[in-house]
């Protein structure tokens, strides 16, 4: 049973994993991450490489390369303890693998190191992580439509995500936010997004720094009656975001989504009762 449960979970996730790894971004990133392994292990390429092994075998790792790879594994394990989504886990593996590959290639040959760095730069400039395109119940706003919607109906609570497409944290949070919108969206509680990369004036209006150093993206703000009630992450006196994990559990707890949802359903019921009463009165007048 202990083996069966993980196996079933893996089989259930296979279709999603196949769609995920079929993206060119992840395929090319994986290829760059294992490039030194391929060069060192695959003949006839490896046969012409220099080596520090005592047996002179150029197609196997020497002791220094093993140390670097072990150090990489330790760093990835430490970083992944704070990761939330699969994308973040894989992103950490790719990033630190490329750093290790750079060190290994430069140690092997200066020209190979320069070639590898050039390939990584070209990859970063031409390939971007795929955006989340799954189901969601989210309304996207511009700088003008956001204020209009917030002021249109004071009974509706809005949770707005301020994001930028270039932010890896925003990309990782996208499926979590979409799932929350599908679960909690109703007449009195709605979810929205604003791209402050496209509308920088919005970031100034709500005091959200778009700088990667500020760590303020994504920012979630709860609006009620057109006024800001609560936001995460909070910002310290130096303008840096206070560390906060954008997990589904944290968002539900900090924003009291269960309580907000119950109150919002009462608004929906009141609206339906009012509509039914008006229809009944109209029908009596017609008689």
Swiss-Prot record:
Domain Thioredoxin: 135-269
One family name in Pfam for this protein: Thioredoxin
Signal peptide: 1-35
Cytoplasmic-side segments: 134-287
Localization in the cell: Endoplasmic reticulum membrane; Mitochondrion membrane
GO biological process: brain development
Keyword match Disulfide bond: yes
Keyword Disulfide bond: yes
Motif Di-lysine motif: chain residues: 284-287
One term of GO molecular function: disulfide oxidoreductase activity
Membrane topology of this protein: Single-pass type I membrane protein
Transmembrane regions: 113-133
Membrane-side (Extracellular) residue stretches: 36-112
SUPFAM superfamilies in alphabetical order: Thioredoxin-like
Assigned GO CC terms: endoplasmic reticulum membrane; mitochondria-associated endoplasmic reticulum membrane contact site; mitochondrial membrane
Keywords: Disulfide bond, Endoplasmic reticulum, Membrane, Mitochondrion, Signal, Transmembrane, Transmembrane helix
Function description: Endoplasmic reticulum and mitochondria-associated protein that probably functions as a regulator of cellular redox state and thereby regulates protein post-translational modification, protein folding and mitochondrial activity.
Subunit relationships: Monomer. Homodimer; disulfide-linked. Occurs in both reduced and oxidized monomeric form. Oxidative conditions increase homodimerization.
Entry comment, domain topic: The thioredoxin domain lacks the 2 redox-active cysteines, suggesting that it lacks thioredoxin activity. The di-lysine motif confers endoplasmic reticulum localization for type I membrane proteins.
Protein name: Thioredoxin-related transmembrane protein 2
The organism of origin for this protein: Xenopus tropicalis
